[in-house]
Amino acid sequence: VWSHDYRVKQKPPYDLALFVGVPENVPDKTFGFMLPNRRDYANDMYKFVGYVFPFNVEVYNSNQEVKRKLGYDSRPIIICSIGGTSIGKEVLELCGKAYSIAKKKIPDLQLKVVTGPRLTSNNLNLPKEVEAVGFVPRLYEHFAASDLAVVQGGATSTLELTALRRPFIYFPLEGHCEQEQVSRILTQH
């Protein structure tokens, strides 16, 4: 949960912050000794909008059709993404290592690594045949085309994958208040 100072220091400052989810997604405990309750603080700082998807799930019910639309061929593809954060280089590189092992069993397997807007693919140690890209608009379309996705534990990506009924593996960041709640949220959906 970001502080009020963060909101005020933005150029221009903003007076509204939206939280994709519900108040129960925020831990009902303090930030620490003598600090406010996280959920109470979030209720004061955010307007909770529920779970919002920028797509109609019915449009993406055939992953082969979505693959064709996006220019992928029919070979199996794994999409590995860390979302909008710069944390997660290790997850992407782990996907590259796992890909090399899996490719021995599934020779036509493809891996696309999405670094997001804050991490460049230049510093990643990945096999040469892995496609690494930065920010991808409408990433949910690529999730819909995937045969497997590997993501960090962010609620938006995991809920999109759940809505799209695509298999995924997620790695929540330890100590991250949102990502520690994701497994509970997913069991409700």
What is the role of each PLM region?
Residues 23, 115-118, 174:
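Residues in the short beta-alpha loop(s) of Rossmann-like NAD(P)-binding domains
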Residues 28, 53-145:
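Donor-nucleotide binding loops and adjacent catalytic segments primarily
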Residues 138-181:
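A donor-sugar binding/catalytic signature common to diverse glycosyltransferases
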Residues 31-34, 120-122, 157-158, 177-184:
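Short, glycine/polar-rich helix-capping loops at beta-to-alpha or helix-loop-helix junctions
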Residues 19, 48, 80, 111-113, ...:
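Structural beta-sheet core signal
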Residues 1-55:
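Active-site-proximal region of nucleotide-activated glycan assembly enzymes
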Residues 2-10, 180-189:
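Active-site-proximal loop->helix
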